[in-house]
Amino acid sequence: MDLSVENGGLAPGFRFHPTDEELVVYYLKRKIRRKKLRVEAIGETDVYKFDPEELPEKALYKTRDRQWFFFSLRDRKHGSRSSRATERGYWKATGKDRVIHCDSRPVGEKKTLVFHRGRAPNGERTNWVMHEYTLHKEELKRCGGEDVKDAYVLYKIYKKSGSGPKNGEQYGAPFIEEEWAEDDDDDVDEPANQLVVSASVDNSLWGKGLNQSELDDNDIEELMSQVRDQSGPTLQQNGVSGLNSHVDTYNLENLEEDMYLEINDLMEPEPEPTSVEVMENNWNEDGSGLLNDDDFVGADSYFLDLGVTNPQLDFVSGDLKNGFAQSLQVNTSLMTYQANNNQFQQQSGKNQASNWPLRNSYTRQINNGSSWVQELNNDGLTVTRFGEAPGTGDSSEFLNPVPSGISTTNEDDPSKDESSKFASSVWTFLESIPAKPAYASENPFVKLNLVRMSTSGGRFRFTSKSTGNNVVVMDSDSAVKRNKSGGNNDKKKKKNKGFFCLSIIGALCALFWVIIGTMGGSGRPLLW
């Protein structure tokens, strides 16, 4: 194959650019083994007989690439040392030799040389660079000998654009647009009716090495017979639009079902909103975010729609009581389980039993002293007497709020037992809460003593002492000061009493002497 420009050459972008591995394993190895190369791109030239400027003319191919390849015989001057001198200069090795690998095995060696003009060692360095490729010793043994076949060496020569390393520099042929201007006149004429054969046609004709441009009349008739045997359309003319061959298919059953669903949605009436949705939609229609007086008009009808017969009694009292009792039963079991795992579980039965009388007495005094009554003027509802602690003997109940004007203090009501059970469950739930009082005043028996002290007056101080029964001792401020001062206070009081007596005696003596002086001056006798 000829790569010269005079014989047609290559299109722009196509160039001879083999890698180091390809140069050694394919080109150099086949040259040493006297094998034929598929492309004769590298000629045989003695590179040491010519200067670098003369070597491009000796290249086998003429593509104006700025790098050239040559096969050359190794000229040995002193044993294994090669002679690298030319008529006007010499090639000097630079850098380290590199080993070329193929499939993780060494196949060759690469040496870099730079041309120096003049005589060694005072030659002038130039920009001409040459890579010398030799076959590795192990690879030579695979070739069958080392006598004559190792004499061939492959050289790649190029010229750098300047001094120093030029990594990434390209050495391909420069592109000249004018050289390819004549190709614009060569128009390609497409036939009006060009046959496009589908991929499913048997390619036995192409297996014979025939090209599409080499078909004769017999081949065309055989091809047409195969096309007719194929199922479906396999031919298309250029004049026919490609849109005709593209047909979209739909499933008619699915299409009819979708149309029926759309029509059914249009014919069916919209669902009516529930009472809860009506309440939400009617409230805050003005967009202000506040409730108006009109929002509460007709509330009875809304509660009736929700299933409540008497919104004033059942919704407020019955639902509240029953719902709270149900939730209390559920929460009591949960809180009891948590209380068992809390630190209050460590208390002994004796301490717990000792705390109950104090708490019961405290709650009994509060409940016996007064009852809680709250008057709701706006709604006219009255709530009286909440339940007491269990075990006190006092009965109370949780009354339902009813409209004003109806008496609600019926203590002999048959539901008395139910309210007592309810109060007992409430106290059981409160006792199961594992909460420690945040302040001393929140403790029930401490608070009871505070109430008693507030009535008697004076200030008291709580002092904790480590006693056997863990009793909190309360002392007044005067008692604490008295304990601190000790016997010093008694001595001061005795001194104060003596001084007070002396002052009284002195006053009496002074009064006596004043009387004596007065009576003696007037001439009256002192004795009556």
Curated annotation (Swiss-Prot):
Coiled coil: none
Induction: By heat, salt stress, abscisic acid (ABA) and methyl methanesulfonate (MMS) treatment.
Tissue: Expressed in roots, rosette leaves, shoot apex, stems and flowers.
Ranges annotated as DNA-binding: 107-166
Pfam families xref list: NAM
Membrane topology: Single-pass membrane protein
Keywords: Activator, DNA-binding, Endoplasmic reticulum, Membrane, Nucleus, Stress response, Transcription, Transcription regulation, Transmembrane, Transmembrane helix
Protein function: Transcriptional activator activated by proteolytic cleavage through regulated intramembrane proteolysis (RIP). Involved in oxidative stress tolerance by mediating regulation of mitochondrial retrograde signaling during mitochondrial dysfunction. Interacts directly with the mitochondrial dysfunction DNA consensus motif 5'-CTTGNNNNNCA[AC]G-3', a cis-regulatory elements of several mitochondrial retrograde regulation-induced genes, and triggers increased oxidative stress tolerance.
GO molecular function list: DNA-binding transcription factor activity; transcription cis-regulatory region binding
Domain NAC, chain residue ranges per copy: 10-160
Biological processes per GO annotation: mitochondria-nucleus signaling pathway; positive regulation of cellular response to oxidative stress; response to red light; response to UV-B
Gene3D superfamilies: NAC domain
Quaternary structure, from the entry: Interacts with RCD1.
Name of the gene encoding the protein in the UniProt record: NAC013
Region (Disordered): 388-419
InterPro entries per record: NAC-dom (IPR003441), NAC_dom_sf (IPR036093)
Domain comment in the entry: The NAC domain includes a DNA binding domain and a dimerization domain.
Subcellular localization(s) per the UniProt record: Endoplasmic reticulum membrane; Nucleus
Record field: transmembrane: 499-519
Recorded GO CC terms: cytoplasm; endoplasmic reticulum membrane; nucleus
Protein name, as recorded: NAC domain-containing protein 13
